[in-house]
Amino acid sequence: MMRRAQRSIATLVAILSLLVTAARTMPAAAQDPGGNVAGDKVSGGKNSGDNDLRDIHLGMSATDLPDAGYVNFACATDPQKTLTAWTGWRDCPADPSRFHAIQFGYDPATSREGTIVAGHPAILTLLVDDAGIVSGLRIETDPKARLYIRKKAFLFGSQVKSRYGLDGWSCTQAQPNAGEQPVGGVYVRERCTKTTDNRSIVVERNLFRKPDQDMKSFVDETRMTILRTKD
């Protein structure tokens, strides 16, 4: 049994190494079959146009947000505080930036695979300002996803960068500290920023293991934040 476990762990490490290599060498179009984060193929089959996610785009009024296709509305700062629809955004307290954060998901009746963005299970948060304008969007890979899906979470960052154009990103890569170790010889702690089309975009990718985590446990995630900028 010990040998079987060791083989399983070795296989997992090898897969992670291959995924990292693929992310570095694969053309952007191949990384993201839908062509963008909000495109037809990656967001439940809806026509996106210039939208940021499905039929949602920054700058639209919260009153124009469609309820159809979305469920599980709740205040991001207090998920126990549920909402019946987008119109309840005022019930969520504003943060220091004066944004009301609403967490939501895709309706399984129209999205059989659940809340999936570009092939990744995701946690979605919409930011509405005091004037009722959609001013931000956060997409985080779901840490509760099954291992065989979660191990690819760091690749979502590459897909986001492809969606908003590969040029013009400013990226920093941190070095491992005493509490972080590479996974299969690979360490990713990257933060990239870009401003384009009245949007400020931040993409954070992490892939590492903490000393107290076993061989099958590690941090593997992407967080994306898009904020509306002034014209």
Regions found by a protein language model. Give the residues of each.
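Mid-chain, structured segments of secreted extracytoplasmic proteins
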Residues: 86-135
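Non-cytosolic coordination micro-motifs
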Residues: 31-91, 130-231
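Boundary at the C-terminal end of the N-terminal hydrophobic targeting segment
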Residues: 25-30
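Bacterial N-terminal signal peptides
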Residues: 11-22
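Coiled-coil-like amphipathic alpha-helices with heptad-repeat character
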Residues: 1-2, 19, 36, 41
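Bacterial N-terminal signal peptides that target proteins for export
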Residues: 2-13
